[in-house]
UniProtKB/Swiss-Prot annotation:
The lineage of its organism: Eukaryota, Fungi, Dikarya, Basidiomycota, Agaricomycotina. It comes from Cryptococcus neoformans var. neoformans serotype D (strain JEC21 / ATCC MYA-565) (Filobasidiella neoformans). It comes from the Eukaryota. This is NADPH-dependent diflavin oxidoreductase 1. Gene3D superfamilies: 3.40.50.360, NADPH-cytochrome p450 Reductase, Chain A, domain 3, Nucleotide-binding domain of ferredoxin-NADP reductase (FNR) module, Translation factors. One of its GO terms (biological process) is iron-sulfur cluster assembly. One of its GO terms (cellular component) is cytosol.
Length: 617
């Protein structure tokens, strides 16, 4: 009997926490499997006797993308009420109590598991980033409770004594081995097997030979997963004025395959960035691994019950350490507590060990040193120069290089065969000497036009009403206007311009007014477009102020005509304030006849009924 740990992570917190749980079980001599929820075969759930679930919460209390397949299956009305009667589960949710629906995805999952007959093992816990010690305040007692409840059911797989978390390096669970250079491996390294290509502008991908592999810089090669497609960068244009502090780009990608299936407005485009070459070289040099960086290797799991993570190449696939660091592992990640726990096990210097003990025992120390200044793993390792991460543990210690998701800013109908994105280049200063730059945005901006990259198109999270007569109100400040632009294009084509309203927000009409000329054209066709340029007057004006100004028609569209509401943009106060503004418009204070409580409930019910949606980040 092997417990199954399933996690759904948005930024990596839930994955990091799940892996800590797995290490705790293994430290106690027990076997355990740890997987993202979307890698777990759903049909096996009723037969999974011991289950441990960890999930973060996405957007307005929504499940993270990795949880959606499992969650959708659990919501099927045809499921018997006792289908999970053999399942015993523990649950830990991660969230931030400053948000309205704190740990909502975890709470929904808990309720549904119990509805289907599953039995709780102990009380669930909710990790709160706002707690004095972050999620640790809830996690550590919950972990001990879970171990106490589960361990008696599990046989010891090793007679070795319990590993002391902070001082002893546990055995590796993954292995990096030299690959044979036989002809069969040479064939495996071909383009057909690995889908490796080099970004030669306007060129075709070049095949890789074994004898060239050690010389080629893996940082310039890409692999394409089966469900991704090739696209070519056609356009990279700055939309903000040159003297404006923020650089926002319109990126256009063209599908290489003319038979690519059209995407739907509201769809999401995923990109897989690459680590910077200088960071990779610095890591290799500090870890004294430069001489091994370009040797052809394969990877495998050393535990039968633990498959390789999905962010790594499949077992047996020839690769190099340089390629792993460039395409699969994130060395610019800001380290969490678990990373410092690993360093504590590896350090050979007494002063370093004392400093690492301080980090492990005090979350504020980690926040001050790493989180607040966005210090990276590479920079952290430079500070702990007596610590080396061995090849045997690199795959376990370094976090995955996560794909980045962007709302598609175009409709297929207006831009056939192309995807347009609105990308803000992230750059800011902290107390560190070197300015911080977003990994994906800086990587994307550095690609020359003509570069071929793999992209993935995911199903929409926002859907237009099927009936074009239904009025819609779109609210998209800043880069949040991306999916709204696609919706406006579709509605104009449907002849529904007069039933479409857009509220766009920017700092100034002269600096960051995205797609201004397009909005002028759409206005002439009947689209109601209101722009809140917050800094163009003495008193700052935001989209929620314009919504309140238009209270009569907002009430008419939302209540009388049963219109839809869409909100997209930053997940700070904006979405909540927009919902409150709409609720005010339909209340007695505005232009309606509802009480304050009734109007807020009406807006919430709109989202429950899928009369619109919210996309925030």
């Amino acid at each position: 009997m092997i417990p199954m740990i399933l996690y759904a992570s948005e930024t990596g917190n839930a994955q990091d926490t799940a892996e800590r749980v797995a290490r705790a079980f293994r430290a106690n001599g027990r076997a355990v499997t740890c997987l993202p929820m979307d890698q777990f075969p759903i049909s096996a759930l009723p037969h999974t006797y011991l289950l441990i679930l960890l999930t973060s919460t996405h957007g307005r209390g929504d499940p993270p993308p990795a949880m959606l397949p499992l969650w959708t299956a659990l919501l099927r009305s045809s499921l018997p009420e006792d289908i999970l009667e053999d399942v015993h589960f523990a649950l830990f949710g991660l969230g931030d109590s400053s948000y309205e629906r704190f740990c909502y995805a975890g709470k929904m999952l808990l309720r549904r598991m119990e509805q289907l007959g599953a039995t709780k093992m102990g009380e669930p816990a909710w990790g709160d980033e706002r707690s004095p010690n972050g999620i640790e305040d809830a996690f550590l007692p919950w972990l001990q409770q879970t171990l106490d409840l589960y361990l008696p059911y599990l046989p010891l797989i090793s007679p070795t004594p319990k590993i002391i978390e902070s001082t002893v390096l546990p055995p590796p669970i993954y292995k990096i081995s030299p690959a044979s250079t036989s002809k069969s491996v040479e064939h495996d390294l071909s383009l057909e097997r690995l889908s490796i290509s080099f970004p030669i502008p306007n060129g075709k991908p070049a095949p890789v030979r074994v004898e060239d592999q050690a010389r080629d810089k893996a940082s310039t090669s890409r692999t394409k997963p089966d469900d991704w497609v090739w696209a070519t960068l056609k356009k990279n244009i700055r939309l903000t004025s040159k003297d404006w502090w923020q650089d926002v780009r319109e990126i256009e990608l063209e599908f290489d395959d003319p038979d690519t299936k059209p995407y739907t407005a509201g769809s999401i485009c995923s990109l897989q960035p690459q680590s910077r070459e200088d960071d990779v070289n610095m890591f290799l040099e500090m870890m004294e691994l430069t001489s091994q960086a370009d040797e052809v290797v394969t990877i495998e799991s050393l535990l039968d019950e633990q498959p390789l993570p999905s962010h790594l190449p499949p077992a047996g696939t020839p690769t190099t350490l340089r390629s792993l660091l460039t395409n699969h592992l994130d060395i610019r990640y800001s380290p969490r507590k678990s990373f410092f726990e690993w360093l504590r096990r590896l350090s050979t210097n007494e002063m370093e060990r004392e400093r690492l003990d301080e980090f492990i025992s005090d979350p504020d120390e980690i926040h001050t040193y790493a989180t607040r200044p966005s210090r990276t793993i590479v920079e952290t390792l430079a500070d702990f120069r007596f610590t080396r991460i061995p090849m045997s543990h690199i795959l376990e210690i370094l976090p995955p290089l996560r794909r980045r998701q962007f709302s598609i800013a175009s409709s297929w109908e207006d831009h056939p065969g192309k995807v347009q994105l609105l990308v803000a280049l992230i750059e800011y200063k902290t107390n560190l000497k070197i300015p911080r730059k977003g990994l994906c945005s800086s990587w994307l901006n550095g690609l020359p036009v003509g570069t071929r990259i793999p992209i993935h198109i995911a199903s929409p999270t926002l859907f237009l009403p099927q009936d074009p007569e239904v009025p819609i109100i779109l609210v998209g400040p800043g880069t949040g206007v991306a999916p709204m632009r696609a919706f406006v294009e579709i509605r104009v084509r449907q002849g529904a311009a007069k039933n479409t309203s857009l509220y766009f927000g920017c700092r100034s009409s002269t600096t960051d007014y995205f797609f201004e000329s397009e909005w002028d054209v759409h206005r002439e066709k009947g689209v109601k477009i209101q722009v809140a340029a917050s800094r163009d007057q003495e008193e700052r004006i935001y989209v929620q102020h314009l919504i309140k100004r238009d209270k009569e028609y907002v009430k008419e569209w939302i209540v009388d005509k049963k219109g839809w509401l869409f909100i997209s943009g930053s997940s700070n106060a904006m979405p909540r304030e927009v919902r409150e503004a709409v609720a005010w418009c339909i209340s007695k204070e505005g232009a309606g006849d509802m009480t304050e409580e009734e109007s807020k409930a009406y807006v919430e019910q709109m989202f429950e009924d899928k009369r619109g949606g919210e996309e925030s980040w």
